[in-house]
């Protein structure tokens, strides 16, 4: 197959190279299925992808950030920065027209004259599966072996720079007097002159490459047989994988090995039982008892509509009740590989020999102690659900409720005294509980012969609670994270409202003083400033009133709706997503214009919502 996608950027004047978005991809796949004998089958697959991606460079000069250029152009640019292109030359207004003479940002600064990237991806996939039936031993028994190999190579070519000479437009009198002449002067000349600024620079070139190889091997014994109303199946599986060139310790392959056992039972396809157990090992843990973990699970289901007492009713087409419990493990929580071993020694200051003529020698120290007891983070999960269908299966409904108890979370110990001479390793001591639910409704129907449509809606809720994180108790309970959700803002004041003129007393000299009955901040405040809560009740708002406040950065509620239709091969879909109970904080660069790196502009809704003497009642921001 072949895929080509083109971008939306136009060819801009003066730019002698193509930096538009372009995507070319060739993919291929070949499969061979063969019966080697009457009881032996083989499946061989070969596939791959050859791709090339081109995109404009989006690094903003002076910020060190690499962001989506369209987001940057909308949020950071100044609407009065310039008129665009005049006579084929990018035109800006003088930087003296913005506060502090900062850099002007127009909507093209993120990609015009910045260069472009080209990324070449090559992927090869091979897989082989051989199955041998063993019905001569017992019907339904078989053994299989499977092997897979993936090879990936990426080459990135970076062409940076390529700046293009621009021009700055001035009023003639402004340019002649260096801005000292007042525009109200009757002799002020407002004719426009264009002064070249900047210069053409060549593109610079660099390239980098990356690669990856993955091996996977699997052997399994399968059993699947039906005895009248009873169906029984079983699986015993061994697998191992090796990943070459991982991100950490690149030249040491990452290895996994595991055993899986599974048994299922069904009676008349209405009573269902599934039991699983996994025994997995990870190289991230020390050899011995901590390297391997046992992860059992089981589930049960009942399809009530398969019962005889449900045969004559015409309301419910399908009803299934289900419940499950399982334990899963995670070895990705480690901050680096091989945490059970001490980190490498490195230079750490120096020490001296002698008194009169001391000789200084470099000192070496271990950067991190090893933790031979580091092991799997585990989570015990429960799930209870119900599936329903009505009106000839046109209306469907699903409800799930889950409970999770997570232990062994790898965290940095907080209660250890600071007099310890080296950094302690992370420990498997964290505990978090989680619970929530998900509800979904769907309607699918057909009008006439060719028109089908669907409407689906869903809502989910999830909230966790920190049970233990080795937190040192703070002076006030509202400062502690334990007992609340993960991901909340720490060390913040609780916002109440904005100060108004009615909160102040005007002195004889016109100076505003906050009314004494209000809590007194440790800094002087004025109308329009944010009022924060006095949590400890000492009538002073200071560092003792900082708390763990608000919701986490991830939403507790997520709402979704999908709608679509299909008519004679033409289909249309749309998706709506919403969230609730979530807090995000904008960085200062997005709240105060012309600050910090990038000299960014201010979002309009921030400006419109700021407190001013004319906008006291409608203000939502200081």
Per-region residue spans from a language model:
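Transmembrane beta-barrel wall of Gram-negative outer-membrane proteins
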Residues: 1-55
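Histidine- and/or cysteine-centered catalytic micro-motif in compact active-site loops
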Residues: 3, 402, 460, 575-579
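Extracellular/periplasmic, surface-exposed regions of secreted and cell-surface proteins
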Residues: 31-40, 46-50, 59, 72-76, ...
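Conserved small-residue
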Residues: 58, 63, 337, 444-553, ...
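Glycine-rich, aromatic-lined ligand/substrate-binding cores of catalytic
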Residues: 139, 552-585
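Short Gly/aromatic-enriched secondary-structure transition segments
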Residues: 160-161, 255, 472-473, 577-580, ...
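Catalytic-site beta-strand/loop segments enriched in glycine and acidic/polar residues
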Residues: 234-242, 272-281, 531-554
């Amino acid at each position: 197959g072949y895929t080509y996608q083109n971008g939306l950027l136009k060819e801009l004047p003066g730019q002698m190279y193509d930096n538009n978005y372009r995507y070319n991809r060739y993919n291929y796949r070949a499969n061979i299925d063969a019966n080697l004998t009457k009881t032996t089958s083989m499946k061989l697959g070969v596939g791959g992808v050859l791709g090339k991606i081109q995109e404009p460079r989006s690094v903003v000069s002076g910020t060190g950030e690499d962001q989506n250029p369209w987001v940057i152009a909308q949020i950071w640019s100044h609407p009065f920065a310039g008129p665009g292109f005049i006579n084929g030359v990018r035109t800006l207004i003088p930087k003296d027209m913005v506060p502090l003479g900062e850099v002007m940002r127009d909507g093209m600064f993120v990609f015009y004259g910045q260069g472009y990237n080209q990324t070449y991806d090559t992927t090869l996939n091979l897989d082989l599966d051989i199955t041998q039936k063993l019905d001569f031993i017992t019907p339904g028994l078989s053994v299989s072996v499977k092997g897979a190999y993936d090879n990936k190579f990426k080459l990135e070519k970076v062409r940076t720079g390529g700046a293009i000479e621009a021009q700055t437009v001035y009023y003639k009198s402004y340019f002649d007097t260096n801005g000292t002449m007042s525009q109200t002067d009757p002799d002020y000349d407002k004719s426009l002159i264009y002064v070249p600024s900047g210069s053409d620079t060549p593109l610079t070139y660099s390239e980098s490459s990356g690669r990856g190889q993955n091996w996977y091997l699997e052997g399994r014994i399968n059993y699947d047989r039906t005895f009248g109303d009873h169906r029984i199946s079983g699986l015993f599986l061994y697998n191992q994988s090796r990943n070459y060139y991982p991100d950490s310790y690149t030249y040491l392959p990452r290895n996994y090995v595991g055993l899986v056992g599974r048994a299922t039972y069904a009676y008349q396809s209405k009573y269902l039982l599934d039991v699983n157990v996994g025994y997995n090992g990870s190289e991230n843990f020390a050899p011995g008892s901590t390297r391997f973990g046992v992860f059992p699970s089981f589930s049960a289901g009942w399809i009530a509509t398969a019962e005889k007492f449900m045969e004559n009713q015409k309301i419910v087409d399908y009803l299934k009740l289900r419940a499950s419990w399982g334990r899963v493990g995670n070895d990705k929580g480690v901050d680096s590989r091989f945490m059970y071993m001490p980190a490498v020694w490195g230079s750490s200051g120096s020490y001296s020999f002698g008194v009169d003529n001391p000789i200084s020698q470099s000192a070496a120290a271990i950067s991190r102690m090893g933790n031979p007891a580091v092991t799997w983070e585990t989570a015990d999960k429960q799930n209870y659900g119900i599936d329903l269908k009505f009106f000839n299966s046109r209306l469907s409904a699903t409800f799930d409720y889950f409970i999770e108890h997570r232990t062994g979370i790898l965290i940095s110990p907080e209660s250890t005294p600071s007099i310890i001479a080296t950094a302690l390793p992370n420990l498997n001591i964290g505990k978090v509980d989680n619970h929530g639910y998900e509800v979904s409704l769907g309607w699918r129907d057909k009008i006439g012969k060719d028109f089908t449509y669907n409407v689906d809606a869903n809502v989910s809720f999830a909230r966790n609670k920190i049970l233990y994180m080795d937190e040192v108790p703070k002076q006030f309970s509202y400062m502690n994270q334990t007992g609340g959700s993960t991901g909340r803002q720490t060390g913040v004041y609780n916002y109440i409202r904005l100060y108004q003129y009615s909160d102040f007393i005007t002195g004889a000299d016109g100076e505003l003083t906050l009314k004494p009955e209000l809590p007194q901040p440790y800094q002087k405040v004025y109308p329009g400033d944010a009022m924060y809560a006095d949590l400890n009740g000492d009538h002073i708002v200071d560092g003792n009133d900082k708390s763990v406040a608000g919701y986490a950065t991830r939403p507790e509620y997520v709402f979704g709706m999908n709608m679509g239709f299909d008519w004679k091969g033409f289909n249309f879909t749309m998706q709506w997503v919403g969230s609730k109970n979530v807090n995000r904080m904008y960085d200062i660069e997005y709240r105060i214009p012309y600050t910090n790196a990038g000299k960014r502009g201010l979002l309009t809704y921030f400006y419109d919502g700021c407190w001013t003497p004319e906008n006291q009642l409608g203000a939502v921001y200081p």
